[in-house]
């Protein structure tokens, strides 16, 4: 129970830090840490597939894209070092306070699929998507296809200067 509460509290603190930091580089680092921590929380809750997708999509693709944009801003190194003072002490303090004030005992492993013996969450997600929600999945694919064709229809045609 201590690790679950600590991870959720860290998610809350990181989401506040993303909005309140003044440096775009530190805001990006806090958002990457937030995505990694949220995938850790999803993994603890039993959503393994969503945790892996969260890591692959957000941390992998968006972080690399934003890092290239931030590298183009050319922020001085002295400004980056000024933002890292004092945050480790605050993190250790919050971790200790959370451990001291634990009220409920540890309840053991919990997940979303405790009633089904031998089934994994990815298998259950596949059964739910392709058996029960197949019509919504097909409708979603049609909407995305229309959006793709709409993007090409609306985009202006560029001509060369000849």
Curated annotation (Swiss-Prot):
MF GO annotations: NADH dehydrogenase (ubiquinone) activity
Coarse class of the protein's main subcellular location: mitochondrion
This protein's GO CC annotations: mitochondrial membrane
Chain's role: Core subunit of the mitochondrial membrane respiratory chain NADH dehydrogenase (Complex I) that is believed to belong to the minimal assembly required for catalysis. Complex I functions in the transfer of electrons from NADH to the respiratory chain. The immediate electron acceptor for the enzyme is believed to be ubiquinone.
Membrane topology designation: Multi-pass membrane protein
Subcellular localization(s) per the UniProt record: Mitochondrion membrane
Protein name as annotated: NADH-ubiquinone oxidoreductase chain 6
Gene3D superfamilies: NADH-ubiquinone/plastoquinone oxidoreductase chain 6, subunit NuoJ (1.20.120.1200)
The UniProt record lists the keyword Signal: no
Family of the protein in this entry: Belongs to the complex I subunit 6 family.
Swiss-Prot/TrEMBL catalytic activity: a ubiquinone + NADH + 5 H(+)(in) = a ubiquinol + NAD(+) + 4 H(+)(out)
InterPro entries for the chain: NADH_UbQ/plastoQ_OxRdtase_su6 (IPR001457), Nuo/plastoQ_OxRdtase_6_NuoJ (IPR042106)
Keywords: Electron transport, Membrane, Mitochondrion, NAD, Respiratory chain, Translocase, Transmembrane, Transmembrane helix, Transport, Ubiquinone
């Amino acid at each position: 129970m201590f690790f679950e509460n600590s991870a959720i509290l860290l998610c809350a603190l990181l989401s506040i830090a993303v909005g309140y930091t003044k440096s775009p580089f530190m805001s990006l680092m806090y958002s990457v840490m937030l995505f990694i921590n949220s995938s850790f929380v999803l993994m603890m809750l039993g959503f393994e597939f969503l945790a892996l997708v969260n890591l692959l999509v957000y941390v992998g693709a968006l972080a690399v894209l934003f890092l290239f944009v931030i590298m183009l801003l050319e922020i001085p190194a002295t400004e980056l070092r000024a933002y890292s003072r004092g945050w480790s002490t605050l993190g250790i303090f919050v971790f200790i306070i959370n451990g001291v004030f634990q009220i409920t005992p540890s309840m053991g492993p919990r997940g979303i699929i405790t009633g089904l013996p031998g089934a994994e969450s990815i298998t259950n997600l596949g059964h739910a998507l392709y058996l029960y929600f197949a019509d919504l999945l097909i409708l979603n694919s049609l909407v995305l296809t229309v959006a793709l064709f709409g993007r090409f229809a609306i985009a202006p045609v560029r001509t060369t200067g000849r």
